[in-house]
C-alpha cells in the first residue's frame, strides 16, 4: 500500500496541469491513510522487536521485504559512481590524448603565388598545423618577402622554419619536433636560391 501511495505521489507531482478540488481532497485522504499505515507499521515494528529471533525469521520469510527510503543513499551512490568514474577516467584520457596527438598532426602543402598567401600560411600555424611551403611559383623577390613575413610570425608563435629543399621550407608549431639530418639537395635545374638567413647577394 505504501509503495502504491509513493507512486501515486510521484505521478501526481508531474500532473499539476489539471488540478481540481476533488484531487486536492483525494490527496488529503491519501495523506491521512499514509499516516495511519505508518502508525500501523510502527506498531508492527515494536511488536516484532519483542518476538524471539526464530519467530522473527519465520515472519520475514513469509512476508515480502519492505524497503525504507534513505535520503542519503542516493547521495552516497552518486559519490561512489563519481569516484569510480574518476579512477577509470585518467587511464582513458591518457590513451585518448595519445590517439588525439597522433591524429591531430597534419601537414598542409602550400604553393604560394603571391605575398598575400603568407597570411593564410601563418593562420595554419596558429591552429597548430605543420605547413610545407614550396616557393616554386613565386619570383625571388616576392619569395624573400613572403619568407621573411612567415619567419617573423613563426618566431612570435614559437614555431620553427626549416629549409628542406631548394625552394621548400617546413613550418612547424612549437609542439612538433623535426629531426632533419644534413641533406645534400641536388640541383634540379632551378637556379633560384633561397637563403634561410635572408642575406642579399
UniProtKB/Swiss-Prot annotation:
Compositional bias annotation for Basic and acidic residues: 27-38, 72-81
Cellular location(s): Cytoplasm
Keyword list, A-Z: Cell cycle, Cell division, Cytoplasm, Septation
Main location: cytoplasm
The UniProt record lists the keyword Cell cycle: yes
Any GO BP: division septum assembly
Alphabetized Gene3D superfamilies for the sequence: SepF-like protein
Compositional bias (Polar residues): 43-54, 83-92
One protein family per Pfam: SepF
GO annotations of cellular component type: cytoplasm
Stretches for region Disordered: 27-99
Subunit structure: Homodimer. Interacts with FtsZ.
Stated role: Cell division protein that is part of the divisome complex and is recruited early to the Z-ring. Probably stimulates Z-ring formation, perhaps through the cross-linking of FtsZ protofilaments. Its function overlaps with FtsA.
Similarity section: Belongs to the SepF family.
Alphabetical list of HAMAP family matching this protein: SepF
PANTHER family, per database record: CELL DIVISION PROTEIN SEPF
Name of the protein described by the UniProt record: Cell division protein SepF
Organism, scientific name: Streptococcus agalactiae serotype V (strain ATCC BAA-611 / 2603 V/R)
Amino acid at each position: 500500500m505504501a509503495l502504491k501511495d509513493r507512486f501515486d505521489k510521484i505521478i501526481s507531482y508531474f500532473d499539476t496541469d489539471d488540478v481540481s478540488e476533488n484531487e486536492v481532497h483525494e490527496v488529503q485522504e491519501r495523506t491521512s491513510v499514509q499516516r495511519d499505515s505508518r502508525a500501523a507499521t510502527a506498531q508492527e515494528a515494536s511488536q516484532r522487536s519483542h518476538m524471539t529471533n526464530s519467530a522473527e525469521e519465520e515472519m520475514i520469510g513469509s512476508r515480502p521485504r519492505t524497503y525504507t527510503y534513505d535520503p542519503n543513499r542516493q547521495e552516497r551512490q552518486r559519490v561512489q559512481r563519481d569516484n569510480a568514474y574518476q579512477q577509470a577516467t585518467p587511464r582513458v584520457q591518457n590513451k585518448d590524448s595519445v590517439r588525439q596527438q597522433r591524429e591531430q598532426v597534419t601537414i598542409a602543402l602550400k604553393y604560394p603565388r603571391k605575398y598575400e598567401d603568407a597570411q593564410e600560411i601563418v593562420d595554419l600555424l596558429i591552429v597548430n598545423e605543420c605547413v610545407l611551403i614550396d616557393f616554386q611559383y613565386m619570383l625571388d623577390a616576392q619569395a624573400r618577402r613572403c619568407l621573411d613575413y612567415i619567419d617573423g610570425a613563426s618566431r612570435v608563435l614559437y614555431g620553427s622554419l626549416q629549409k628542406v629543399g631548394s625552394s621548400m621550407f617546413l613550418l612547424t608549431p612549437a609542439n612538433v619536433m623535426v629531426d632533419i639530418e644534413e641533406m645534400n639537395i641536388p640541383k634540379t635545374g632551378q637556379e633560384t636560391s633561397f637563403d634561410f638567413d635572408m642575406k642579399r647577394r
